[in-house]
Amino acid sequence: MVRYADDFVILCKTEEQAKAALEAVRAWVAEAGLSLHPAKTRVADARREPFEFLGYRFDKGRRWPRDKSKRKLRETLKPHLKRTGGQSVQAVIGRINPTLRGWFGYFKHAEAAAMREIDGWVRMRLRSLLRKRRGRRGRGRGDDHHRWRDAFFANLGLFSLEQARDLACQSMKMAH
């Protein structure tokens, strides 16, 4: 047995089953001379109470990346998306794509809306960078969406989380 079990979730159909499972885990852990952390151990109805686990937020049967996970991704990408970086947009895209692919690899089971939100933020930062190159201030919004459409960034090779998720979902449907 491992010295400690950091995080795990047990899903049951009824509250009685959940309580029985909790007691079984308590006994199993006690046999090893360990104990469950009281503040982190609970029986909850996942249909009514959202819970967070391993970077995801589970809410009403849906999976979302935790706000903390999205914030960390933005913090990782920001240094590459600075308006004063002096690199071509293609070079910037080349630097951020591996991070986006890795993040998608872990969060590919999250809701499409979460992917759309991150994609939009990345494109807004890239539009802002392009505005700066034209001697303009501000964020990449409004008319910039017409000037530099999403397809513009796709043609430059920007990895789209939403498109990757759509493809992954299609592949899963085809397999069944």
Where are these regions (language model features)?
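Non-catalytic terminal/accessory segments
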Residues: 1-176
